[in-house]
UniProtKB/Swiss-Prot annotation:
It comes from Bacillus subtilis (strain 168). This is Spore germination protein KB. It is found in: Cell membrane. Its main location: membrane. GO terms for cellular component: plasma membrane. Pfam families: Spore_permease.
Length: 373
């Protein structure tokens, strides 16, 4: 797994699929009401800054794993502690994403099936993919990205043709001022989905060419932000803001409204395929980061074997994380962003970025002085 190589194009596709993932299931920026789409765009702008930090650290240490460059910046003991905390973070978020998609399948397809069965089936596929390595995941992302794009385009056309879009549901814009939007940005959308790209610090070392990481990564994030904002705006324009916020899965509720010429309806099950693809990749990448982080920290010679215990742990956590879906959503919206995402996505990476840039300048200065001698 650690010797695998992926292209910058594959990274581009993986970022888009990862970003869309579970963010299309719910309503990002829900605290902003009918202005949620604005909160998504502003959150994306901050997400671009966060990605700049993440790739900036990598560019300072292009040939090192996160554990190795934290050793250089923090010392062995602190590096070990923070590496371990990030492993727990990746595993925890993987469990939350797995729970999201398990609940979706229970709601729309498998009403009487225990959630542990549904989650277990999803996790088995992710474990298999992670054991095959990041190269296989990247190639699968390239292949399935086209299917997601096609399904999304068909869905947009059908919604327009069905005549269910009412732009008036998006008005008045900023009726309550900018404050609710900014509150939503700094408590929701800057973290999910955009700050979640912190995971890619575990994937950057696998790139075969690092010169276009910043450009391609930011383009991928901008595209993702536009797609998520458009999806939120369509949900609100079709369902109205009240129903959008009450719906557990507003995109699928929007798809259910499609009815063309009395024969084309109930397409939500069909479009669940696109969502499941996104969910599979998101869970798989979080599992991959957990496995790679654990193998690096504990010097495991056969990292792929860790996919089994890590996957089982994430599966169990996804069931025990909340007693019901309402509690799960409440924690995800009100607790996780400020108490979990904030330190792992912003505070600690910002500190590492400052230290990395400072150390890089010191190294360059030292080399310059030696050259003069």
């Amino acid at each position: 797994m650690e010797k695998a190589r992926i292209s910058i194009r594959q990274l581009f596709v993986m970022i888009i699929i990862f970003e869309l993932g579970s963010s299309l299931l719910i309503t990002p920026g829900s605290m902003a009401g009918r202005d949620a789409w604005i909160a998504v765009l502003l959150g994306c702008a901050i997400g671009l800054f966060l990605f700049y930090l993440y790739q900036g650290i990598y560019q300072c240490y292009p040939n090192s794993s996160p554990k190795e460059y934290m050793d250089d910046m923090l010392g062995t003991k602190l590096s070990w502690l923070f590496s371990f905390l990030y492993i727990l973070y990746f595993a925890y978020i993987a469990a939350r994403v797995l729970r999201d998609f398990g609940e979706m399948l229970l709601t729309f397809a498998y009403h009487d099936t225990p959630i542990i069965i549904v989650n277990a089936l999803l996790m088995v596929v992710s474990i298999y993919a992670v054991r095959k390595g990041i190269e296989v995941l990247a190639r699968a992302a390239e292949l399935l990205f086209g299917a997601m794009y096609l399904l999304g385009a068909i869905g947009l056309v059908l919604i327009i043709v069905s005549g269910t879009i009412d732009p008036h549901n998006l008005k008045p814009v900023l009726a309550n001022g900018i404050s609710p939007v900014l509150h939503s940005v700094f408590t929701q959308t800057m973290y999910v989905p955009f700050g979640e790209v912190v995971l890619f610090v575990m994937i950057f070392p696998n790139l075969n060419d690092r010169k276009d990481v910043k450009k391609m990564g930011m383009i991928a994030m901008a595209i993702s932000g536009l797609i998520v904002a458009l999806t939120v705006a369509i949900n609100i324009s079709v369902l109205d803001v009240d129903l959008t916020l009450r719906s557990q899965f507003p995109l699928l509720s929007t798809i259910q409204t499609i009815k063309v010429e009395e024969f084309l309806d109930r397409l939500d099950v069909f479009f669940m395929l696109a969502l499941i693809i996104g969910g599979f990749f998101k869970v798989s990448l979080y599992l991959y980061a957990t496995v790679v982080g654990t193998s690096t920290l504990f010097k495991e010679k056969n990292p792929s074997q860790l996919a089994y215990p890590m996957g089982l742990g994430i599966l169990i956590l996804s069931i025990t994380i909340a007693t019901n879906f309402s509690e799960h959503l409440n924690e995800g919206l009100n607790v996780v962003p400020l108490y979990i995402h904030l330190p792992f996505q912003l505070l600690f990476p910002l500190f590492l970025f400052i230290v990395a840039v400072w150390k890089k300048k010191r190294r360059e200065k030292s080399k310059g002085e030696e050259a003069k001698k």
